């Protein structure tokens, strides 16, 4: 299934999200900047993309992830871990970046800074319960299943 995601360029320099390879799970998002943006170590910035999108409906979510190369090579990550964009959002896609390295990193205008993944999503009906079904794991949390 290939859902149709409408986009609107809010800035003429915006780059339409593209999949880098035929098997790519996410499309690249590019920075729309007037000048290069240097992030000092531990500095955060909201990087504009110049794009707004319309998802096909409430059964769809857009997830924004860091690009693995920027994270591993330069320590540039999403400040919020993963961006979650609901189907009713119509504003600009902006990428909250943080530089976790010990060196400054400069984002260039037009640079690919994040990945946009479109996925199905359910809205759950939350129901109170006095008891929950027992499982082998039970209440075991962080690290409880071993290395």
Where are the language model's segments positioned?
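DUTPase catalytic domain/fold
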Residues: 1-147
